[in-house]
Amino acid sequence: MKAPHLALFALLAAACLPDAQAADGPVNTRLERVLAETPLIDGHNDLPWMIRERFKGDLGQIDFASDTSHIPPPPDGVALMTDLPRLRAGKVGAQFWSVWVPVDLKGLEAVQTTLEQIDIVKRLVTRYPADLEMAYSASDIRRIHKAHKVASLIGIEGGHQINDSLAVLRQMYDLGARYMTLTHTRNTAWADSATDAPTHHGLTPFGVDVVHEMNRLGMLVDLSHVSPETMKAALAASEAPVIYSHSSARALVDHPRDVPDDVLRLVAQNGGGAGALQCAAVRRPLHRPARPRQGGVGGLGARAP
């Protein structure tokens, strides 16, 4: 294995906006102590794409050091959900910035757009050096957290973004990507998505090669968005812990993007970690009754090693 995996953390979270208010009293005191010592990792944040689409990638149009929620959203969009004050208030120790591109972008266009997304992340971090710093390893996250800054990492949200090329995967790693979600909302040529008709019933031989190359590099295999068959195939193929950057338990919310209990048990055996998705925007009303229970459910077995 080329590099230590970033899954060496006790806490992994993926959130848009928290639904619950901060805890009070002894619980809050304990949380403050834990989060001062252990970096809370938000596994998925789509801010780079919002900056690209709304501001054409021009960071000068937003003041990330102030509350950005007052910026009017586009007619068919949502308000910005992230800024430095809210990262600090949420005690975020490390943030995976998603460099997602739409699944209808193919080939070299998908690769180029991914590179442009990576550029947005790095320029954002450079613009706020007192608060943000790029991280490429577990030790980087610990060091940056101790310096009271938010460690910034890059996650690729879809295997379509490497254009079926292990060489592109390697170069994305060299540019800072530390996880890749194997699919987004549609199948790739080598892996099935949770929200598309099954084609491969898991991974193709090339898909297994992708997992093995990610293992070799020290790049996290992210199983959010993939089908249960793909989850199981990737868990069988992976020689390192996997993650779910933004998925929840299907037993609580019966959504195709969430993780069945039998797979969660395999994740525990793998030593991997599952984040908790708190973004109400991706929940249809049909699925929302379980939301009040999510914050209080523990002991599911999956953990970060």
Language-model features, listed with the residues they occupy:
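Bacterial N-terminal signal peptides that target proteins for export
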Residues: 1-7
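Bacterial N-terminal signal peptides
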Residues: 7-15
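N-terminal hydrophobic targeting/anchoring segments and the immediately downstream early-domain regions
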Residues: 21-200, 254-305
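Histidine-centered catalytic micro-motifs
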Residues: 40-47, 226, 244-247
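Distinct, well-ordered alpha-helical segments
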Residues: 165-169, 230-240
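Alpha-helix-loop-beta-strand connector modules within alpha/beta enzyme cores
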Residues: 199-217, 234-244
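Substrate-binding cleft of carbohydrate-active enzyme catalytic domains
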Residues: 210-223, 227-233, 261-272
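Short, catalytically relevant binding-site loops at active-site mouths
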Residues: 228-229, 249-251, 280-283
